[in-house]
């Protein structure tokens, strides 16, 4: 996964990204000349320009949140109206990268300390609570990090913290890579999301860290035992992203969490073994794994049949048990799935369980398929049967509320999605939606090599009926002339 950007705009809501720039409050009016007015032709007409200062405080604070913290503080010099506005913004971003980029190396150490001291004052002067805080720092100010973390958690009750260590290189022998923080530094009840980039992981900051629901670790160095203990201490995790370089591969990495729903793993170095035991897991996103073996106990993903484990390496693969859960949760998952490692496009295969009668689930499937720019290797589809129970928090649209997604202006799948081989399980030829999906795969050239439909496990009568429907699929005009359609 690509190292997360620490810019203020990337950590803020996309809805604010198009906010117009601030206008100077002391520029009260401006002379504009116009030739369109017969009365005012050739005369100077004064129009008030500083309408932005008349906006409500909440709106001004949202606008300021789109700026870096340094720029937001500078706006306090515009007028009395702006003096305290920055002090209540819900998002703060401390970004020190420009110190290294724009100054000689001999001055970086001194300037870093000056900047850190000013940011300490800024944090102390801020009023109210924070939604998020991003700290992108360089190695010279590690002494300030612990103090800042305590301030933003205990005093500001920040919900989301992002820490990025901007250093030139990563080696296990450089001490400043270690994240030396106070015991239980990340254990404040308000903190629910934590992202760390380029650190050597230590356990003490995570003691009894049951408050975290989201943990993202990018370019992290850690012993397997330390990482296992950190995951165990974060007992309420729902989302876990691991991009790890292990220092000690002797033991097995254990991920045992009763609440974990999303797991994404990437590591370029060989490890011994990974053991996953997560009863609520619905997404297992493997970017790359090199290890002697792994085991996964996840009931919602156990029905998938395909195996992409070959010779100590797993091909990139995404397993997703689709359900119509809260949109905010699904949005977070999709954002993590679309993020790429080292700017590489998503490749490999996809396994999904989906009810194509449910428009909500079909919409989610559309979004997932859009993650592939190029041709997908394998697509495994497990159709949910009609008696599948509705999960907690899931909605289901029936009757006239259903829309036929294979009709209309934007049919699904679109004309650009391509996959080499599709494997279908629980296919019911009498189901209008399932047959329509298979038909589109055939006729518009979605599948380029094989469409494989599992029928051998059906009772004799159902097997005959299903294979008769498959025969109808074979009679359809093929988007790819040499497409092979088989029952197995």
From Swiss-Prot:
Region of interest (Disordered), ranges: 1-21
Coiled coil regions, renumbered to chain: none
Highest rank taxon of the organism: Eukaryota
Protein name (Swiss-Prot/TrEMBL): F-box protein At3g60790
Domain F-box positions: 49-95
Pfam families: F-box (PF00646), LRR_At5g56370 (PF24758)
CDD domains, alphabetized: F-box_AtFBL13-like
